[in-house]
Amino acid sequence: MATVPEPINEMMAYYSDENELLFEADDPKQMKSCIQHLDLGSMGDGNIQLQISHQFYNKSFRQVVSVIVAMEKLRNSAYAHVFHDDDLRSILSFIFEEEPVIFETSSDEFLCDAPVQSIKCKLQDREQKSLVLASPCVLKALHLLSQEMNREVVFCMSFVQGEERDNKIPVALGIKDKNLYLSCVKKGDTPTLQLEEVDPKVYPKRNMEKRFVFYKTEIKNTVEFESVLYPNWYISTSQIEERPVFLGHFRGGQDITDFRMETLSP
C-alpha cells in the first residue's frame, strides 16, 4: 500500500493523457474524477486541462484534492503560445465565481438615530431682560418683576449634529412644553428669526435642518447664538423694552447678542 508523502517534498504528480493516472512516488492511483480539455477561450495552439483527484488514505482518513492546471502545446505545434492577460483572465473566471460588490448606503435618519441630549435653560440678555412668549409665535425681551418671573420662557436646548469648531457647539432651541423651535428663514433679502411649529413625533432629532441650528459660543460668562444657515447673523435683542427677539447682523453695537444662561435641573 502506498504511503502518504509530504505534499511538497515527496509527492510528484504528473498528468498522463493516455490512461488518466496520477503517478505518485510508489505507484499510480486511478483518478476518482477527471475533467479534461476544457475550452476556456482562445488559447492559440494550446489548451487547458483541469484534473481533480480525490484520494483516501486509511491511516489518516484525509482527503487529498489535487487541482492541476497545465498548459500544453499541441503535439504538432510549430511555435510556442505566448501567455497573455486575457488567458489568465479566462482561467480565473472559470475557477472563481465573480460576484458584484454592493455598497449599502444609509440615510441620515438611521445614522443619527441616537437619543438627543438636551438641557433646560433660561436666557437673559446682558441688560437682564427676560425672554417671554408674548403671543403664540412671538418672542419678546422685557424686564420682569420678581412676581412675574413665571412668564419667563424655558428653553429646551438640544445638542445636534454639526461641525464643532472654535468652541462653537451646534444646538437647537425649542420652547419647553411647546412644539415651537427658533428657526432662521429669509424674507426678501434679509434673514429673519421666527418661531416655527414642528411635529413633536419627529422633533427634536440629531439631524436637524440647518434653519433650526445655531452655533452656541461661550464668551466669559455669556453665550451667543450664531445662525448656521446664515453665518454672522446672531440671535439679538433690542435696547428698547418689549421688542421682539430678532436676527441681527452686528455684534458689540446697539443690538444685544450676548446672553446669560441659567441651566435648570432636570
Swiss-Prot record:
User: Principal localization?
Assistant: cytoplasm
Q: Propeptide-annotated positions?
A: 1-113
Q: What is this protein called?
A: Interleukin-1 beta
What GO CC annotations are associated with the protein?
cytosol; extracellular space; lysosome
* Biological process, per Gene Ontology: cellular response to lipopolysaccharide; cytokine-mediated signaling pathway; fever generation; immune response; inflammatory response; positive regulation of canonical NF-kappaB signal transduction; positive regulation of cell division; positive regulation of immature T cell proliferation in thymus
Q: Where in the cell is it found?
A: Cytoplasm, Cytosol; Secreted; Lysosome; Secreted, Extracellular exosome
Recorded family membership: Belongs to the IL-1 family.
Q: How does it assemble?
A: Monomer. In its precursor form, weakly interacts with full-length MEFV; the mature cytokine does not interact at all. Interacts with integrins ITGAV:ITGBV and ITGA5:ITGB1; integrin-binding is required for IL1B signaling. Interacts with cargo receptor TMED10; the interaction is direct and is required for the secretion of IL1B mature form. Interacts with HSP90AB1; the interaction facilitates cargo translocation into the ERGIC. Interacts with HSP90B1; the interaction facilitates cargo translocation into the ERGIC.
Species of origin: Bos taurus
Misc: IL1B production occurs in 2 steps, each being controlled by different stimuli. First, inflammatory signals, such as LPS, stimulate the synthesis and promote the accumulation of cytosolic stores of pro-IL1B (priming). Then additional signals are required for inflammasome assembly, leading to CASP1 activation, pro-IL1B processing and eventually secretion of the active cytokine. IL1B processing and secretion are temporarily associated.
Give the taxonomic lineage as stored in the record: Eukaryota, Metazoa, Chordata, Craniata, Vertebrata
What PANTHER family would the database entry show? INTERLEUKIN-1 BETA (PTHR10078:SF30), INTERLEUKIN-1 FAMILY MEMBER (PTHR10078)
Q: What does this protein do?
A: Potent pro-inflammatory cytokine. Initially discovered as the major endogenous pyrogen, induces prostaglandin synthesis, neutrophil influx and activation, T-cell activation and cytokine production, B-cell activation and antibody production, and fibroblast proliferation and collagen production. Promotes Th17 differentiation of T-cells. Synergizes with IL12/interleukin-12 to induce IFNG synthesis from T-helper 1 (Th1) cells. Plays a role in angiogenesis by inducing VEGF production synergistically with TNF and IL6.
Keyword terms of this UniProt record: Cytokine, Cytoplasm, Inflammatory response, Lysosome, Mitogen, Pyrogen, Secreted
Question: What are the transmembrane regions?
Answer: none
Give any GO molecular function from the UniProt entry.
cytokine activity
Site (Important for interaction with integrin): give the residues: K168, K176, K178, K187, K201
Q: Which Pfam families does this chain map to?
A: IL1, IL1_propep
